Amino acid sequence: MCIRDSRDYLKEKGHDVTDHGAHEYDALDDYPDFIFPCAHAVASDTDSKGIILGGSGQGEAMAANRVKGVRAAVFYNGPDEIIKLSREHNDANILSLGARFMTEEEIYDILEMWLDEPFGGGRHQRRIEKLDH
């Protein structure tokens, strides 16, 4: 799956999209160079969400989570409940996808599910506030 495909898909669904790259494959690229601009943009706008794609999504999420205010969740396959709970309970504001382990159709389904799931608040808000201290 190409990042451009997911960007175009999200635009077609009515989402505002800012693409922080990479725009073409370069084996010499380092993912933090693309993840940090996304993470900083999300951290500075509490209404925004970020979608990052990598082979496994693990390193990308680790990089994003270095930015204060970011709560990046990793998903590369499994029960749909995992993706819903990342929003409902953890208010994940970045979704890091392991594109190597998912089909294009699965990625589209997960993007919709994740973006549509609201944060539950309540006791979960208290826990999230503790993450930033």
Task: List each language-model region with its residue ranges.
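Hydrophobic alpha-helical packing residues
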Residues: 6, 10-14, 64
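Short, glycine-/small-residue-rich phosphate/pyrophosphate-handling segment
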Residues: 78-126
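Short, well-ordered secondary-structure micro-motifs
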Residues: 29-32, 62-65, 85, 107
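A short beta-strand-loop structural module common to alpha/beta enzyme folds
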Residues: 16-28
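Short, small-residue-biased leader/transition segments that mark boundaries at the very start
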Residues: 1-3
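Helix-adjacent hinge/juxtasegments
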Residues: 34-74
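Generic secondary-structure signature for well-ordered alpha-helical cores
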Residues: 11-16, 40-44, 88, 112-124, ...
